[in-house]
Amino acid sequence: MGLFAVIDIGGTSIKYGVINEDGTLLETNDRDTEAYKGGLSIIEKVKDIIHELKINNDISGICVSTAGMVCPKEGKIVYAGPTIPNYTGVEVKKILEEEFNLPCFVENDVNCAALGEFFGGAGKGTHSMACLTIGTGIGGALIIDGKVLHGFSNSAGEIGYMMVNGEHIQDIASASALVKNVALRKGVEPSSIDGRYVLDNYENGDLICKEEVEKLADNLALGISNIVYLINPEVVVLGGGIMAREEVFRPLIENSLRKYLIESVYNNTKIAFAKLKNTAGMKGAYYNFKENFNK
């Protein structure tokens, strides 16, 4: 085996490329998902991408990371929300293996991003990791001894639905929640500002932005403390656009964690920030392929 097609299907864009056995991306590109056209349209687009990659590369396998709840054994979309209509039930693995006569393995996008960070990023060298992606919502993944914890019905790690202070954590600690709350207090449309605006103004001393950023960090820390008490991971990795501002969030989250974790647990809890950025999903899709192909 030599080269592999890696596909990362998100709600906005499909990132793709070719990776070698060492986990080095040799080429990458992206195109619009056009999710509104539905799940089968996306799969047709993925087929076109792989056909293109095969023109100049001897592809030995197909590695897919995708939005939605995935049954990794069947490579099937168990559930996808309204952002990708008619995606639930699509048998991604079966369709692509029949089209290309190549092995294909499929995994949830947050799990793939976590695998990427575990094997080649912020979690490298550890044995257990929790990964939270802070974006429009909050995605989560749990890795124990190098393997994604899927749970009985493949819903382990759906951290965004965890109840914190009486609400789903993604409704009070996501980037979209931060923007919405700041916009509401300032009397502007949420579409007129973004996370960068909030964080820039936080650093410039804006009181509203300061209060809302601190509130988000505290809610996030409370959620992290629940995860830590439950599975005691060696490291908690935080990713997503706003978490690129580690200098803002690290001190806030760590200060709040001191409130929520007993001292002995706090002292053994490491917070890290994602390193791989946009390539995490593609690299994780390859690590998932390698793990399953070698079983």
Curated annotation (Swiss-Prot):
Q: Which CDD domains match?
A: ASKHA_NBD_ROK_FnNanK-like (cd24068)
Organism domain of life: Bacteria
Write down a Pfam family by its short name. Answer: ROK
What does the similarity note say? Belongs to the ROK (NagC/XylR) family.
Question: Can you say what this protein is called?
Answer: Uncharacterized protein CPE0188
**Species:** Clostridium perfringens (strain 13 / Type A)
